[in-house]
Structures are given as structure tokens and as C-alpha cells.
Amino acid sequence: MSATLLVPSMTVKAADTIYNNKTGNQDGYDYELWKDTGNTSMTLNAGGTFDCSWSNINNALFRKGKKFDSTQTYQQIGNITFDYGCDYRPNGNSYLCVYGWTVDPLVEYYIVDSWGTWRPPGGTPKGQIQVDGGTYDVYETTRYNAPSIQGDTTFKQYFSVRTSKRTSGTISVSEHFKAWERMGMRCGNFMKPALNIEGYQSSGSASVYKNNMTIGGSSSSSGNQGGNQGGNTGNENAGNNLVTVADADKIQCETMTKSGQYTGNISSPFNGVALYANNDAVKYTQYFASGTHDFTLRGCSNNNKMARVDLKIGGQNKGTFYYGDSYPAEYTIKNVSHGTGNQTIELVVTADDGQWDAYLDYFNNSVEPGCSLVPGAVVVLVALGSSSNTGNNSGTNTQNQKLIALTFDDGPSSTTSQVLDMLEKYNVKATFFLIGQNVNSNTASIVQRQVKMGCELACHSYTHEDMTKMNASQIRNQIDWTASAIKNTAGVDVKFFRPPYISVNNTMYQNIDLPFIQGSMHNDWESSTSASQRVNSVLSSAKDGDIILLHDFQGNSQTVSALPQIIEGLKNQGYTFVTVSELFEMKGVNPNVEYKIWSNVK
């Protein structure tokens, strides 16, 4: 999303007051008053602010926020925050919260900062999270055949309820969604988040004197409320407007230096730059204090043909951004090694065949300490992420070692426990590619044992279906749900992905932000392959840097029986066993290569 103010200039006029059910849009905010019975009033003040009162009601709500069309996840929309202040005076049961819905799955959610006589929703929390400098209890409930945005149906309710009340501050909606997903609570496509006052069989009043909704920009992952508010000081005078992230957080491509015969500005599907032909380019200058970074570009093709934009730093090609259709998306080239000091950075088209154009929107602006604009430079290319040197770690102590990585697919299961027994006996680590739906309360102890033993956990999809038959949203869900299940169970992040059936296509490459891993295969999923055949297959084909693909699905006893001879045989051949992460690190190889699936690292 381009950093564009969504609200037109306003003419000051007397505030409207409504008394009955009504929805509409005012000053860029979507508003709603809803009640089933009783007396209500809602005065629509400027921007996101409003006053409301209620009495003799069964249920009533008053809110201002933003409606979305339910086609994008919160990750695609960007970070959403509410900076609010409210004089809140409930008499009885009431909430002050951010409220909304997601679809696919259908979820009604509440982020509650204050309440009346009853603290919602009752019951036992799933756990606690730290967001915006406060602690929230998290709850998940199910409503059966209840009213929803899709009629009477069954759906989930998610609650984050602050442990201590407050009536002003920042609510970082996206951070709650991230925390919920880490706890295994799936979130779907976004609809109408809003700052909400709700009453139930009660009376009261509220004056929302501040309500700034921000879309896009940097995440408040630190949970520091002060950091959020401080980051918005540039918009203090926009307190009554719906705003997107400040310009300082985005670098718009149309402001950059252009070169080439046809390079030019565009206004659709965003305000940006079009590269129409080979050698069309935009150039940048950046000072780097360290030599490894991630680079992210938002863009798209002008049609359904694959557009390619090369990234050059210091005249050297560092990778390519790929855009497979006309839907704008962010793509990242990770762990790029480059020179330090002043560097010329170029985004350039070199593979144009006359069938597509490349549209460029923006770079995220998150410059690290030690990086700065060069005097006179037109623009900075953003350097995201850490400055680790994992891409250059090969040293004399490892370069002559023969390394091999054992990996196992389709767990966790009871067979996984038997595999772990063998690995523990021989003091060997492995990488396990887990199926997300198999990670549950019955297998949690197995997953935790894997981590305790120093093994690595990776993603093998959530349902183990052929993902080449899925759309982009379904593909991302498979990854996100699995990562959340693993994070919630074992507290670790996944770093690699192995596609089910080793079946891949461009849509998968474009929507999965993890390195793809294959490996050498030994037919150990076939019950007709004997234990000795599995041993011989592995030992006869092993090479330095290999990733060996085996399976720990329920009942795969032949692989368990083969493991002692496989491990002993590889040790006799001089191999050291490492995880997949260690294999890349010790070989000094960057795994983040677009459109590549790895079986050997060298």
C-alpha cells in the first residue's frame, strides 16, 4: 500500500447525531450504530472521534474504523494500529475495545482495554501475551448457530483482554493477530476493524476524543507502547484523520533517480514507477556499515506474465525479484552480501521479452544504525533485518569436513519417538519437516523433545496436500498455520520448507518466504522397500553436502530399523551429521535463492 493520506480535506461543520441503526462513512472512517432495543445516540465528530450514550438496551454498539473487502490477510494489508483516548463511563456490562471479523475462517475478535462490571469473556485463558507495554489474557470460544456477518452459523471468537484497565493508548491490532496465530488460533482475511464501545443490558456514555487508525508501516514487535506513539508524532495534527504510515517509513519509487529509454511514473495500480524495456532502471546510493542485509520491494507485473527485476549492488547482480501477476505484492531477497561504505544500488530490467512490464511501488524504510543517506543522494535503499554474516561463515575448521544432514518428513507420530531414540543413542541431530495438523496436544511432548535434543523443526505444510493446486492465499495459510502450531508448541521458528510430494510451481515460490528443501530420496515411504535396501540406497549415493530425505510417519518401522546401519555407515565414511541450518552455515552458502529447491549444499 502506498503511503497515501486516505482522507480528503475537510470543511468544518456541525457534528451529526444519529439515534437509530445506521452505517456510513465520514472523514474517511466507516461508522456504525447498532442496537436491538432501547435508547441510543451517537454524535459523529471529526475523523475517528465520536460521543455516544445508551440506556434501557439489550445490546448496542458504537464504532468507527475501516471496512476491508475480505480479500486480504492482515499480513497483506500491513500493520494496523489504533491510537486512541476515551472518557469512558459505563454503568453495568460494557466493553471498550477494538472489534472486527475475519473470514476463511470466520472469526469475531475483540481486543479489550477496558470494561464495566463484567470482565469478558469468562472462562480460562489459553495464555498471556505482551503487547503495547501491557499484558493481555487470550481466550478462544465457539459460538454455535449464532448471528454473524454471514448469517446464523457456527464461528470462533478470539479475545485479548488487558489484565489492567486503561482508556487511552495504542492498540497494535496486527501484533495481537501474530500472537494468536503463534497460539494456533487461525486468522483469516480482514474485515472492518474498528474502535468499539459496546453495551449489554446496561447504560452509560463515552466520549472518544482521539481515534487515529494507521495502516501500514513498521511492526511494534517490541510491545513498547511508547515506541508506537512516538513513531506517530509526525501525524499529531492528523488526530481526526484516517492515516497511513508516515512517509519516513516508506521510500516511494517515483521519487527515485530514473534511467533507461522508457522508465516513467505510473498512477495505477499504485503511485510508482514502470520499467518497460531492457535497461530501464532506478538507481540509489546507500551507506552500509555492515555487509549482509535483506532487501524488500513491492511491485507487480502489468499482466499475468512473469516480470523480473534484477537487484544490483556495486555493479554486481545480487538476485532477482519475480512478480507473476498484476496483484501488488512484497518480495524479499534475504541475506544479500555486498560491499560496505557508499554503494550504488540499481533495480533494472534485463530479461524483457516484450510481453510484460514491471511496476515498482516502494521499499520499506528501516535503516539500521550505521547506515545513512549519502549527501546529495536522491533516495536510500532500505536495509532490513540483521547484519549477520551467515553467508560468509566457511572457515578452515569446517571447509574440509564431510557434512551430511538427515531429515525426516510427515511427523510427528509415535514413530518419531523411535527415530529420536536412535538419534539419541548415536548422539546425532536431524531436521524434522512437520505436518502442521499433526502438531497437537497428543504430540506436543515429542516436538518438545526434538528441540531439547538439538534437532531442527521445519515446515512440510499443514494438511500434506498437493500445494500446486492451491491459490496464493491457501498456500500462505498452509505455511502460517504450520509455523504457528510449531511456535506455540515448541517456541521455535521454522526456517525451511519441503513441499508435499516435492511438487512445486511459481505460485508457491512467490508466496512462501522460506528456502525450499528437497533431498536425496530412498523410497522409504514404500512398504516394499526393505530396511537393507534403504541402508544400501543411502550409503551408496551419499555425497558431501547431501540432504537425506527419510520419513517418520506412523508405522514406518523399516526406516527405524535401518537407522543404526545408516548412521554407523555414514560415520565410517567420515561424515559429520548436522542440521539443515548448520549445513548451509558451515558450507558458507546462502539458502535464500529464488526459484531453487536444494538437495545438496556445496
From Swiss-Prot:
Ranges for domain NodB homology: 402-578
Family named by the database record: Belongs to the glycosyl hydrolase 11 (cellulase G) family.
Pathway given in the UniProt record: Glycan degradation; xylan degradation
GH11 domain residues: 17-211
Thermal behaviour (record text): Optimum temperature is 38 degrees Celsius.
Ranges for region Disordered: 216-240
Gene: xyn11A
InterPro entries, sorted: CBM6, ConA-like_dom_sf, Galactose-bd-like_sf, GH11/12, GH11_AS_1, GH11_AS_2, GH11_dom, Glyco_hydro/deAcase_b/a-brl
Descriptive protein name: Bifunctional xylanase/deacetylase
GO annotation terms (biological process): xylan catabolic process
Active site: 108 (nucleophile), 198 (proton donor)
Reactions catalysed: Endohydrolysis of (1->4)-beta-D-xylosidic linkages in xylans
Signal peptide range: 1-14
Assigned keywords, A-Z: Carbohydrate metabolism, Glycosidase, Hydrolase, Multifunctional enzyme, Polysaccharide degradation, Secreted, Signal, Xylan degradation
Practical applications according to UniProt: Could be used as a feed additive for animals in order to diminish health problems due to undigested plant fiber and enhance proliferation of beneficial microflora.
Organism: Pseudobutyrivibrio xylanivorans
pH dependence (record): Optimum pH is 5.6. Active from pH 4.0 to 8.0.
Enzyme class of the recorded protein, top EC level: hydrolase
Described function: Endo-acting xylanase which specifically cleaves internal linkages on the xylan backbone, releasing xylooligosaccharides. Is also probably able, via its C-terminal domain, to remove acetyl groups from acetylated xylan, and thus it is probably capable of hydrolyzing acetylated xylan.
Localization per record: Secreted
GO molecular function terms listed in the Swiss-Prot or TrEMBL record: carbohydrate binding; endo-1,4-beta-xylanase activity; hydrolase activity, acting on carbon-nitrogen (but not peptide) bonds
GO cellular component: extracellular region
